[in-house]
Each structure stands twice: as C-alpha cells, then as structure tokens.
C-alpha cells in the first residue's frame, strides 16, 4: 500500500490486528503495530481498539484490555456491545463473574443495549458455578428486553441443573422447554443432557438421549461420548461401556485423557483387568503414556479380578517406566492382600510404603485402620501380629515433635547440677 502511496486508515489497521491475532502473533506485537500506525497518522477508533482489546483478552490480559478501554473512553470513543462482550467473556472464563457483572451494569448504565451474546456470556459463567436460578432470572430479563433466548442460552440452563446430582429432572425439563419453543438441540445440548442423566444415575435415559441425538442427525462429539461412558462407569455396566467405546472407535473419534481414565476406572472397579489392559494399549497408540494414576487403577483391576499375585509385577513395570509409586499404589496393594487374607504381604508393602515416605492422607488412613481393626479379630496368631503391626504403626504417619525446651528450664537444670557439685565438694 505504502509503495503505491496509499495511506492505511483505521479500517486497514483493525483488519491487520485481527489477522495478526489469528496468525498467532502476541497482543504485544499487535500493540506495537498499532503504535507504528498511530505515528503514521492512523487515529484511535472503535474498530482498531476493539481488535486490540480482543487480542489482549485472548491472551488472558484482561486488566491491560480494560486500560485500553479506559483510554479509549477518555478520547471520546464510546464502547459498543462487542467491546463489552469481549471484556465480559474474558472475565467470566477466568471465573471472575463479579467483574463481568460490573461491566454488565456499566454497559446498561451507559445506554449500551445488551445482545443475546451478552446474556449467554453471563449464563455460561453461572452454569459453571451451578447456579441455575440466576440463569432462569437472566432468561426472563432477556425476554423482557425483547431478546429471544437461543440454543446456547438453554444449553447453559441444562448444564447448570445437570451438574447437580438431585437436579437431573430439572435439566431434562429445561431440554423439553427448549424443544417446545422450537429451538433445535445441538451436540452441546445433548451432551449437557447426557451428563445430567449420568450425574443423576439415570444411565438408561442417557443412552436413550444418545440414540435420539443420532436419530436427529446430530453427530456426537468426544464430550458426548465421554459423558455417556461416565454414565455407564458409574452404573458399573462394563458390557455397555465396551459397546460405547467400540462405537466411538468406529466413529473415528479420538479420546482424551479424561475418556481414558473413565474407561480404565470403569473396567478396573469391576475387576476386568484384560479390558483395562486393552484401554492402555489402544490409548498408547495415540500417545497417552501410562501415569502413576493409570497403574493405580490397573492394580485395582487385577486385585478385584482375583489376580493379586500379579501386583508385584505391576510394581516392577512402574519402576521400569520411572513411575514412583504413591500412597494410593501401596494402599491398593495392602487392601488387595488383606482381602485375600495374605496379611504377611500386606504388612510387607506397608513397610515399603513407610520406607519410601509415601504416607496416606488421614481419611484414607482411618479407612484402612477400620478395615484392619476388623481383620485383627482373626484367631491366627501370626496373621494377628502382622495386622497389629500395621495398625499400631500409625501407617507411617508422623508423630508430633516434642516442643523445644525453654532456655530458662534448661539453665535451671544446669544450675541444680552445679549446686549439687558444690555441696559434694
């Protein structure tokens, strides 16, 4: 442009800042570019500053974005709904809802008309905070202003109810209300509903919702599959868990670490150690390396599947992968051996746990003590001795150190000794 003697203006500048943001340039780069353009005569404008604020907000630099908005207002450039929405969204996503509410109040006080996006930003924030009653009020306020709630508005409401165990029916009701007013559900809406059923323990309804979704031609996402898998993990239905996982693989949907842990835990808790191994193998193909948590769940699978003799081998595998066993690893092994009344091995791994400095938290310790106290009623003297060895050791929990002696009493004792020597002399 400049070689052809064409001077860039504020529109050119705002487009360039947007392109820079999308190409991965930092907010600092965008600010420096704007300053260069400003020196060349490009003035401050709503378009330019809106693009700059977006760049800063995307990097989480909310306070800096707020300073730019403040400077903009000082120069007589009023913020519009887009600028306010950008700022509110940044604060909401950082769980700073009070600041977002403050901007919402300022926006209305200055006569800037909120949009559907404005309300959806607040609804999304309150959804994450599990406050459906506030979302219900925002929906009413929105309608009073002549704005129609959309699919995102209702999805926030479904999600807010669905995150709470005893409100799954309210989530289902919100879903029906949405359909009643003619709004078509999206993948996000169905995922929120499936998650609600999962949390509420209604795994059959979760699967029905999944089937309805597919019937309506809506493609399930990884979030949908993860929510559905979690429903059947909670229900302990490993057969359907495997079926859903196979469906996911046939749809060529790659799992996440959350999906991996849900599947592994689901099979482990029912003692399906072969399936648990399959999960580790399949997810290993897409780069998910086993962690200490992975091995803890795998040990649980082998223990519950009656394969406690394989646990030492798993411990060796961990060492070969440079994974350090934690208190949960050792507790899992101790539980496994106590379950089959192999108290000697339980005591051995308890000693290993204490030796390695891996001490369970007080709650886990109390749980283990209560189990061992019951087992200590055994008539076998050797077994009883091994159990009491664990119980009485306080599981390696640190004993409170004695307080430092007061110097006065230390000297007093010394003085007595001196006096006694003097008398003896």
What are the residue ranges of the model-derived segments?
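N-terminal targeting peptides
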Residues: 2-18, 22-32, 36-47, 60-66, ...
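Pentatricopeptide repeat
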Residues: 9-14, 18, 30, 45-50, ...
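Non-globular disordered terminal and juxtamembrane segments underlying protein topogenesis/assembly
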Residues: 21-22, 57, 71, 92, ...
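TPR-repeat structural position
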Residues: 27, 62, 97, 132, ...
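Alpha-helical solenoid repeat scaffolds, predominantly canonical TPR units
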Residues: 33, 68, 103, 138, ...
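TPR/TPR-like (Sel1-like) alpha-helical repeat modules
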Residues: 343-360, 373, 384-396
